[in-house]
Regions:
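Short glycine/threonine-rich loop-to-helix capping motif typified by GTGT followed
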Residues: 266-275, 304-321, 340-347
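Condensing-enzyme catalytic core mediating Claisen C-C bond formation in acyl metabolism
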Residues: 5-9, 33-36, 213-289, 297-298, ...
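ACP-dependent fatty acid/polyketide chain-elongation machinery
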Residues: 1-67, 243-253, 350-365, 408-412
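Conserved beta-ketoacyl condensing-enzyme motif
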Residues: 8, 24-25, 29-161, 190-199, ...
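Active-site-proximal alpha-helical scaffold in enzymes
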Residues: 78-91, 139-143, 147-191, 229-250, ...
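A glycine- and small-aliphatic-rich helix-loop capping segment at beta-alpha/alpha-beta transitions
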Residues: 22-29, 112-126, 176-179, 199-212, ...
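Glycine-/small-residue-rich "gating" segment that lines the acyl/pantetheine channel
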Residues: 123-130, 171, 175, 191-247, ...
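Flexible, low-complexity linker/loop segments at domain and module junctions
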Residues: 1-8, 96-97, 289-295, 323-326, ...
């Protein structure tokens, strides 16, 4: 069966840099920092006091007040991003409802809701928790609510693969279209886990930065790095079969050409030595897209700001790209947004598509002290206009989940 070409026709995002695509991308290009003091709970007694929060988000711009009370924050963020992406695409979702699917990831779903309802149960009895507790909390509900809101009756799933989930969602959607199952997919990721239990759990495993200065907390590839900064938000893309998009005169941002996914099968949190799983994953994505390593100009790296991730990912890039690795603009936008966990891959796919459109690599901010183990071109502190034909986006998750996407500049 002939494989169909897949393009991006709609983008939407809500993240620590902005509540829509335009504001977020302007901030990313300018190297703004979206990290600040935690405001969603009193973190004064916590070692970690910083996060990448979404600012001034009004759920009633998405749903009415009554409906908002039935949804967890990660679902509301996903709905906002999806609404922007679908509007941006110009799709007639009612006319094509049965042909449009949804794949949207969340790593931990409604964790803050679980905490809130457990407290309520302890105080009033467990049978007094909200009747909406379970549907609010489960990770698939953001995907489901997008499908319900827009009447989308194609395949609807939720990859729960930790920090690789958003990229798995986009990649799985790409393959669904390429292989002829649906002509259109709404895909990406969403997360909102900035809560006492979320921050406490990641702090306990020594994964989070405990820096007090927002400009010295999320430090991907820098020798000073000491952990990631929790972020929240959602990134959603509309993917579409090329001829379907052309037939309706859709605007095209970029083309998705390759996807790789695999597992380290090594450890539940630590990456495989030398980035072995990431090496294979990037090779799978390049082979899937029939793209040579030398063709890649830009990588939106996983780049969390943990010691092991950044050194292993750098080693993996060296192994895959050889002498060409030093010519690639390798960027961690997590330096600006923090780590959105299951939402990261969606937001970073949005940024990668825009980088290709605008021929501009956003910076890795806060970069001051080079690490001998991290010796690539990280576009330090100031973004760069550059010619780019192909770009790659990496996501590496707890459990050894690896996912990689390859995008191509749209020449139409």
């Amino acid at each position: 069966m002939e494989k169909r070409r897949v393009v991006i026709t709609g983008l939407g995002t809500v993240n620590p840099l902005g509540n829509n695509v335009s504001a977020s991308w302007d901030a990313a290009m300018a190297g703004k920092c979206g990290i600040g003091p935690i405001t969603q709970f009193d973190a004064s007694e916590f070692k970690c006091k910083l996060a990448g929060e979404v600012k001034n988000f009004d759920p009633e711009t998405v749903v009415d007040k009554k409906e908002a009370r039935k949804m967890a924050r990660f679902t509301l963020l996903a709905l906002a991003a999806a609404a922007e992406a679908i509007a941006d695409s110009g799709l007639d979702t009612e006319a094509e409802a049965r042909q449009i699917g949804v794949i949207l990831s969340s790593g931990i779903g409604g964790l803050p809701t679980i905490e809130e309802q457990h407290t309520r149960g302890e105080e009033k009895g467990m049978e007094k928790v909200s009747p909406y507790f379970v549907p609010m909390s489960i990770a698939n509900m953001a995907a489901a609510q997008i499908a319900i809101r827009f009447g989308l009756k194609g395949m609807c799933t939720c990859p729960v693969t930790a920090c690789a989930g958003g990229t798995n969602a986009v990649g799985d959607a790409f393959h669904r279209i390429r292989d002829g199952y649906e002509p259109v997919m709404v895909c990406g990721g969403a997360e909102s886990g900035i809560s006492p239990l979320g921050i406490g759990g990641f702090t306990s495993m020594k994964a989070l930065s405990t820096a007090s200065d927002p400009d010295a907390a999320s430090l991907p590839f820098d020798a000073r790095r000491g952990g990631f900064v929790m972020g929240e938000g959602s990134g959603v893309l509309v993917l579409e079969e090329l001829e379907h998009a052309k037939a309706r005169g859709a605007h095209i941002y970029a083309e998705v050409v390759g996807y790789g996914a695999n597992c380290d099968a090594y450890h539940f949190t630590a990456p495989a030595p030398g980035g072995a799983g990431a090496i294979d994953c990037m090779k799978l994505a390049l082979a899937d897209g029939q793209v040579t390593p030398e063709a890649i100009d830009h990588i939106n790296a996983h780049g969390t700001g943990t010691h092991m991730n950044d050194s292993c990912e750098t080693a993996a890039i060296h192994a895959v790209f050889g002498a060409h690795a030093g010519d690639i603009a390798v960027v961690s936008t997590k330096s600006m947004t923090g780590h959105l966990l299951g939402g990261a891959g969606g937001v970073e796919a949005v940024f990668t598509a825009l980088a290709l459109r605008d021929q501009f690599a956003p910076p890795t901010i806060h970069y001051e002290q080079p690490d001998p183990e991290c010796d690539l071109d990280y576009v330090p502190n100031t973004g760069r206009s550059m010619k780019m034909e192909y770009a790659l986006s990496n996501s590496l998750g707890f459990g050894g989940h690896n996912a990689c996407l390859v995008f191509r500049k749209w020449e139409g």
